[in-house]
């Protein structure tokens, strides 16, 4: 989950063409494009040892960065074999014919995915994607500075006593999601007036904001640089392992529900390898490693039975069903993404 990340197309083109040579797509190589810190490196090495497939692993920091690079690789006839877009980008990429169907018959471990996380509106029947990790964005509080019992709403971030103490994720849709929710508007609105009003609300928050961070949002909390703000539930889990004073709060208006997914681009050369890598990560013993090491809620029935009771029952790592139900998932806003980006740019330069 993550952020708007502006790149010049020139730089993207140069980096992309440099990355992919004509011989790069032999079946013994698999080009994976994923979020930072989403798969432990030793698991990647284990996959290569088992299959003989060399994984060329690259990372991105936002859906926008991933999408822009895939657009360029479509035009050059090269590209990645496996990508991990968020739900609203899956829908966008399906519409633009950027993804090919996943052959579920090749996935012996697909039954490990809980059924209630399948068949979502952004990809009915999961023809083009499967859930990798999911979670909720809520509020982190340092109990040494702030009583967590006094924090119940997203609106609490605007309290004047929190000047210079707030962290917001560096993700336009997430940040505007909060303001739109407080304004009583849909977080997926395409109405510019609604987005502008949300921007004006966020302007008033800026004196409180110490940083925008979507790289490792748990770090500023652990290091005491901020005392309250946005955080993903998995990052909150990792943060509390470092500092027991950090508490995670689900806001009464609802947290932000997100899901990042396996998807195979239409330009993929090693489609067989992509399926093998998906199935490898769906193994319960491997999913367990991802959950424990990375701190993300990986939907895997078998993995949950392998976890200690303390981890399996942690409400940060595995959000309660009522909070998931209350959470609102981001949807594709079409061309209105440019409106969000415009006001996001204004907000970040204030």
From Swiss-Prot:
InterPro entries: SBP (IPR006059), Sperm_putr-bd (IPR001188)
Pfam families documented for this protein: SBP_bac_8 (PF13416)
Keywords: Periplasm, Signal, Transport
Signal peptide region: 1-26
GO cellular component, one term: periplasmic space
GO BP of this protein: polyamine transport
Subcellular location: Periplasm
Gene3D superfamilies named in the record: Periplasmic binding protein-like II
Single Gene Ontology MF annotation: polyamine binding
Source organism, top-level taxon: Bacteria
Known function: Required for the activity of the bacterial periplasmic transport system of putrescine and spermidine. Polyamine binding protein.
Family: Belongs to the bacterial solute-binding protein PotD/PotF family.
Name recorded for this polypeptide: Spermidine/putrescine-binding periplasmic protein 2
Gene that encodes it: potD-A
